[in-house]
From Swiss-Prot:
Activated by threonine and tyrosine phosphorylation. A motif (TXY) lies at residues 178-180. It comes from Arabidopsis thaliana (Mouse-ear cress). Keywords: ATP-binding, Kinase, Nucleotide-binding, Phosphoprotein, Serine/threonine-protein kinase, Transferase. Signal peptide: none annotated. Dually phosphorylated on Thr-178 and Tyr-180, which activates the enzyme. Residues 440-452 have a biased composition (Polar residues). This is Mitogen-activated protein kinase 17. GO terms for biological process: positive regulation of peroxisome organization; protein autophosphorylation. It is an enzyme of class 2 (transferase). The modification Phosphothreonine is found at residues 178, 183.
Length: 486
């Protein structure tokens, strides 16, 4: 009965056996399922009436596309997207994810005996996934414990890229957003006060710092009731910003507000966080620096002494920045049917044979015009004249003489034509340097042996490796199991 209620007329549904509903929300329903053919367990996310609001449909399209382009062991993976029954009229989307048992929010809430080794390994995976994401010039923009999935073996994965954005500049900055609505408690101060018009990956690094502090203490670091209260809590700990930091704030109103704030001195972290490893506190202090220029990048944070004995650059891959061509739809106004067609095209990425047929069909469509081109008209006229001349020759009449002559005009390339080669080269160069072994057919710059080694980095080594083999810490204690998915 559950399967009939969950699935509609999607033919591929028959290969999955729904077990239970594990989540509901405004987006739809998530159910755990099992594939009888493979015996593997997955999470199927059913999104209903996707195209009712174009803005919501674009957000879903963006997230699905980003998850395909950002394949990494520390980022949740889309295994499959079911093919809609009708290309032009489908309304629902079924996305098949790898099944994760819980999320970091639940882990921190129900486990009061997490060890420093847990904290170290959780943070290492988070930063490693973020390094890969930022190297592609992608900002997550909504990092929080609920958006970090977790398993009983302490494996975590970043999820929910619905608010993520891509920067297409030479450096991953210069991005202006007016739709930023991420959770306030993990929001960087420059976003709370709209300090700048351009932001950098440092906004994600602030969120990482807040999450790290929550791991260490078991409670949110800055649980502000509103934006003003949020800034009050931040300055209570970090002190009021220095004149140099204030001078960098472009928003005059925000700069004036902070300048008029009662002078506060920073609280020593050893007082705020007693009994915490000093090495961990030094990293935390770097992550939640008030000035974004003072925060480390994900790559720099991974090199911090806190991860000594665990970090390994060979298992911390990067990738090329994402090509503009992948998100050209962001720059034009789309109708509901436009988004539906783009979504269908993205779904076909998980159906290679149909994708090939679709692309061949596009070529055929593009080769036929509603109206004949100038070349076609010339060919038709030339054929008519030849036929007419043949008739005249049969009647021994003089050949037809043209009144005017002209040379073909030289084609003038538009700026788009001139840049097509460079754009193509850019697209080709944006290949994923690392691909998880779950998708061996995906193009990758690593050998299968190397890819296997990288995936093994998901298993902690040295200090954190003891965590997995310790008799005193069982997997069920590591994670309070409560099924969750992105």
């Amino acid at each position: 009965m559950l399967e009939k209620e969950f699935f509609t007329e999607y033919g591929e549904a028959s290969q999955y056996q729904i077990q239970e509903v594990v989540g509901k929300g405004s987006y739809g329903v998530v159910a755990s399922a099992e594939c009888p053919h493979t015996g593997g367990k997955v999470a199927i996310k059913k999104m209903t009436n996707v195209f009712e609001h174009v803005s919501d449909a674009i957000r879903i399209l963006r997230e699905i596309k980003l998850l395909r382009l950002l394949r990494h062991p520390d980022i949740v993976e889309i295994k499959h997207i079911m093919l809609p029954p009708c290309r032009k009229e489908f309304k629902d989307i079924y996305v098949v994810f790898e099944l994760m048992e819980s999320d970091l929010h639940h882990v921190l809430k129900v486990n009061d005996d997490l060890t420093p080794q847990h904290h170290q390994f959780f943070l290492y995976q988070l930063l490693r996934g973020l390094k890969f994401m930022h190297s592609a010039h992608v900002f997550h923009r909504d990092l929080k414990p609920k958006n970090i999935l977790a398993n009983a073996d302490c494996k975590i994965k970043i999820c929910d890229l619905g608010l993520a954005r891509v920067s297409f500049t030479d450096s991953p900055s210069a991005v202006f957003w007016t739709d930023y609505v991420a959770t306030r408690w993990y929001r960087a101060p420059e976003l709370c006060g709209s300090f700048y018009s351009n932001y950098t990956p440092a906004i994600d690094m602030w969120s990482v710092g807040c999450i790290f502090a929550e791991m260490l203490t078991g409670k949110p670091l800055f649980p502000g009731k509103n934006v003003v209260h949020q800034l009050e809590l931040v300055t209570d700990l970090l002190g009021t910003p220095s004149p140099i930091t204030l001078s960098r704030i472009r928003n005059e109103k925000a700069r004036k507000y902070l300048g008029n704030m009662r002078r506060k001195d920073p609280v020593p972290f050893t007082h705020k966080f007693p009994n915490i490893d000093p090495v961990a506190l030094k990293l935390l202090q770097r992550l939640i620096a008030f000035d974004p220029k003072d925060r480390p990048s994900a790559e720099e944070a991974l090199a911090d002494p806190y991860f000594q004995g665990l970090a390994n650059v060979d298992y911390e891959p990067s990738r090329q920045p994402i090509s503009k061509l992948e998100f050209e739809f962001e720059r034009r106004k789309l109708t509901r049917d436009d988004v539906r067609e783009l979504m269908y095209r993205e779904i076909l990425e998980y159906h290679p044979q149909m994708l090939q047929e679709y692309l061949q069909g596009e070529e055929n469509i593009n080769s036929h015009f509603l109206y004949p081109s100038g070349v076609d008209q010339f060919k038709q006229e030339f054929a008519r004249l030849e036929e007419h001349n043949d008739d005249e020759e049969e009647h021994n009449s003089p050949p037809h003489q043209r009144k005017y002559t002209s040379l073909p005009r030289e084609r003038v390339c538009s700026s788009e034509d001139e840049g097509s080669d460079s754009v193509h080269a850019q697209s080709s160069s944006a290949s994923v340097v690392f691909t998880p072994p779950q998708t061996p057919n995906t193009a990758t710059g690593l050998s299968s042996q190397k890819a296997s080694q990288v995936d093994k980095a998901a298993t902690p080594v040295k200090r954190s490796a003891c965590l997995m083999r310790s008799d005193s810490i069982c997997a069920s204690r590591c994670v309070g199991v409560s099924s969750a998915v992105s």
